[in-house]
Amino acid sequence: MDEVRGLVREAAEWLRTSKDTDQWADPWPDRTGQRERILNDLLKGKTWIVWDGTTPAATITVDTDEPLDLNDQPVWPARKRHEPALYVRRVVVSRRYAGKGLGAALLDWAANVAKRDHGATLIRVDVWTTNTDLHTYYKGQRFIRRKGRDPRDLTNYPSQALFEREVTQPGSDYKKLFVEEGDRGERKSS
């Protein structure tokens, strides 16, 4: 868990100093809540860590359960809930590995998992509302912005920019970047 939290802290610092955004400036919903969410996702096998030797290079969380706000209300609008989708969260690449296509490879890997393991036709992500650079990144990864719920209906939920992508052929050759290890399915970058 410390590796994931370390990657998130590193990303938060970079976002604050280099991108002038408040994304992850404070743990959401608070330190304890963030810690519990990360731990639960790890224990349930939803969070994956990409390792380069003993160094954590990136992390991604994939989940068939839709994200919820603080009142346990779904983030995605009702009209979209019937579509089979895999939800992607907490995609973080260490700055040391930035610009090498690792984020794109993780998203392509998630699309493959969505189709292969869950029969899903979409991968979805809810992106920090005010981080327009990140919105542009996801658009560059073949995601389309979708209309969400009325922001007044969501309780203190900072990621209200909703994006989805059809599960198609990957844009990257993620299989060359990852080598599966052990029966936990951890991935190492090569």
Identify the function of each model-found stretch.
Residues 61-98, 153-155:
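Conserved acyl-donor/pantetheine-binding loop and adjacent beta-alpha core of acyl/acetyltransferases
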Residues 44-63:
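Conserved beta-hairpin
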Residues 80, 125-131, 139-141, 147-190:
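C-terminal "cap" of GNAT-fold acetyltransferases
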Residues 4, 38:
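Hydrophobic pocket/interface hotspot
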Residues 93, 99-112, 136, 140:
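Conserved acetyl-CoA-binding loop-helix of GNAT-fold acetyltransferases
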Residues 107, 114-126:
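Conserved GNAT acetyl-CoA-binding A-motif
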Residues 9-37:
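Conserved GNAT-fold acetyl-CoA-binding loop/helix
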Residues 49, 61, 87, 92, ...:
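Conserved beta-strand segments that form the floor/walls of ligand-binding pockets within enzyme
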